[in-house]
From Swiss-Prot:
Biological source species: Toxoplasma gondii
Cysteine disulfide partners in this protein: none
Name this protein carries in UniProt: Dense granule protein 4
GO CC, alphabetical: membrane; symbiont-containing vacuole membrane; transport vesicle
Keyword terms of this UniProt record: Cytoplasmic vesicle, Glycoprotein, Membrane, Secreted, Signal, Transmembrane, Transmembrane helix
Amino acid composition bias (Polar residues), ranges on this chain: 227-251
Length: 345
């Protein structure tokens, strides 16, 4: 039996070699032998390059042409103060150019990168420190910039300001690494920080050019006049405080007038209080009398009628009213007659 299987295997191999290895079974044996491994490797490398081009080079910076590309190694985070006193944060990736001199068309930076001048807007979320601040350029520049940063949690906003980034440990022109605890950066590269008043800060446009106010509007306090009238209800004194003097002047005549006025107010209040109490007492007496009369009537008391319309009523009209949906005589009619007869006797 073993000889038969061996002879069959020899016949199959000879037929495969005779047809040049084009048979399906022969090609399977060739694949097992590694003859087509080079083709599979090339196809795998092509797939790898294709998927890497789709998913392997993603950056958080979208460019104008819709393609994703690696940003320059350095950028600049501008902190611009508006003429109205508000702040906004603008992040812009630098363009590889020759460093410009002070007052040139761009903003000089370390490493030959500079900030193109332009108009910027800032989307600021009002609230406590920790809310995001997103800076978006108002018009397309040579490079697009869209970055989200956060308020420094260690620096609370003073007054009505939404956020202020002026840490004491950072000086104008200094570089801050992403490990700084006062600000959370998304990129793992150093950023140059520009402050208002330096050569690297572009001149911001007037506040009217922004789409909306960065800070909420707060009502202003009314202006104080030179003399303010101060009234004290506890002591009944009224003095005039002048802006030049720090004390109020009260004369004895004013004290006597205030005391007499206070006495008049007290007597007036007592009279009103007595009148109210008297009215309440009369109302309570009338209510009690009405309740007593109603109770007597309910227990069968005599009923005196003054209305002329009650003259034509029947003798059974002693406060009893049959329901309108049941006009038949009540079963208690006989009892009422007996009570009326007993009352007359």
């Amino acid at each position: 039996m073993q000889g038969t299987w061996f002879s069959l295997f020899v016949v199959v191999m000879v037929s495969h070699l005779a047809c040049g290895g084009e048979c399906s079974f022969g090609s399977h044996l060739a694949d097992m032998a590694g003859l087509s491994g080079r083709h599979d490797k090339e196809r795998h490398q092509a797939k790898k390059r294709y998927y890497h081009s789709m998913y392997g080079n993603q950056t958080p910076y979208p460019y104008a042409n819709g393609q994703q590309a690696s940003p320059p190694p350095q950028g600049q985070l501008l902190i611009i103060q508006n003429p109205d006193g508000s702040f906004m944060i603008v992040d812009q990736q630098g363009v590889p150019q020759v460093p410009q001199a002070a007052g040139g068309p761009g903003s000089p930076m370390n490493g030959g990168y500079y900030m193109p001048t332009g108009v910027y807007t800032a989307q600021v979320v009002p609230g406590t420190p920790g809310h995001p601040v997103q800076a978006i350029p108002q018009q397309p520049l040579r490079t697009q910039a869209t970055a989200t940063y956060y308020h420094p949690a260690a620096v609370p906003p003073p007054g009505p300001s939404v956020f202020v980034f002026t840490p004491s440990s950072v000086q104008p022109g200094a570089e801050v690494t992403p490990g700084y605890s006062g600000l959370q950066l998304r990129q793992q590269s150093q950023y140059g920080y520009s402050y208002p008043g330096t050569t690297s800060t572009p001149t911001p446009p007037p506040p009217a050019s922004y789409g909306y106010p960065v800070f909420p509007a707060f009502p202003r306090l009314p202006a104080f006049s030179d003399s303010v009238s101060v009234s004290t209800e506890d002591s009944g004194l009224t003095g005039v405080k002048d802006s030049s003097s720090s004390e109020s002047t009260v004369t004895p005549a004013d004290e006597a007038a205030s005391e007499s006025e206070e006495g008049d107010k007290t007597s007036r209040k007592s009279k009103v209080k007595k009148g109210i109490l008297t009215g309440l007492g009369v109302a309570a007496t009338l209510a009690a009398a009405a309740a007593a009369a109603k109770a007597v009537k309910g227990f069968g008391g005599t009923r005196t009628s003054t209305a002329p319309a009650e003259a034509g009523k029947t003798e059974l009209d002693d406060g009893y009213r049959p329901p309108p949906f049941n006009p038949r005589p009540s079963p208690y009619a006989e009892l009422l007659k007996d009570l009326e007869r007993m009352r007359k006797e």
